[in-house]
Amino acid sequence: MGITSAEGVLGGAAGGSWLRMKFSEALLLVAAGTLGGILSTAVSIASLVTYPALLALGVPPLSANMTNTVSLVLTGAGSVLSSKPELTGQGRRVIRLGIVTAIGGAAGAAVLLLTPASTFTAVVPVLIGGASLVLLVQPRIKGLSPSAGGGNKMAYIVALFAVAMYVGYFGAAAGILLLVVLGMMIDESLVTVNAVKNAVSGMANATAAVCFALFGDVRWAFVVPLAAGFLAGGWIGPKLVRKVPAGPFRVAVSLCGVGLAVRLGISAYR
């Protein structure tokens, strides 16, 4: 039997081995993962690209979210490794807060697994729209943070747990929310707080990914190219962000997010 194209060599079902995936599908996922990794580095909203890319390839909404979460695990590990200098002396704090976020991530995953798929489909447009608006007003939100160490510590722990649950459930723009909450709790430089955020967010994402891998419908065929893209984007992102004006970039991404939310909302509610 003759082979006429790379797509013919790699053609196969979405649920099979990634080696059998169509070349065009793999290319789309690598590209989406790369852009998602850049957005994750810049504005903490990788799902704005990768989630609709999975939907475009015919993956059901619930499975797309689970697949996206599993693919992000290596990105979290990479961000922690790259933040080792800033995490020096933060080990106990990361473990203490990481326990909270790990449990929260698992709880968010449990909510996703135990509720109907139709509920997730209906809620996602709201989550994406809300995340896009949070991104738009990000500087003002950060400006509202009180001095670290003040206020009710238990209230901050509850807020941290709630955001970690959101990480496990969907997670778009969760990094922004985590940065705000941790900024209230930790009396350190923004660079250090961001490094702690990367670590504890990675723990929430990891426990959610384990739950999805064990009990959910992860499309493993799509995980490898998407994860490869995330790794590439995570490396490119910091270099690119230094050269792009933050304000216009944030507004453009926010508007795209609102547009995506409207599109998904029309599809979900019609």
Spans of model-derived segments:
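Selected transmembrane alpha-helices and immediately adjacent juxtamembrane segments
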Residues: 11, 15-60, 145-194, 201, ...
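Transmembrane helix exit motif
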Residues: 77-88, 126-149, 259-270
